């Protein structure tokens, strides 16, 4: 029976994201799991347009952008040891994690 774990990471800062990915891959390899990835997923880009003036000057606007970077890591042949190793990793607060078990 194969145990497969998919870990999807999200962050606005790609440096924090890559640092977290390295930590997860290192601890997974130490526990004996086979690692596929990191697979970079498409970056989501959101643009917000806001009027600078509260009353007139409709043509005076400012645009803000938010990019969400994503990575996917697939772990094969995971064991309880792998799960314990992953629980002990300290991930920065700017990184969100979504884990799917199969």
Swiss-Prot record:
The gene is rpsJ. GO terms for molecular function: structural constituent of ribosome; tRNA binding. Involved in the binding of tRNA to the ribosomes. GO terms for biological process: translation. Part of the 30S ribosomal subunit. One of its GO terms (cellular component) is ribosome. Keywords: Ribonucleoprotein, Ribosomal protein. Signal peptide: none annotated. InterPro entries: Ribosomal_uS10, Ribosomal_uS10_dom, Ribosomal_uS10_dom_sf. This is Small ribosomal subunit protein uS10. Pfam families: Ribosomal_S10. Belongs to the universal ribosomal protein uS10 family. It comes from the Bacteria.
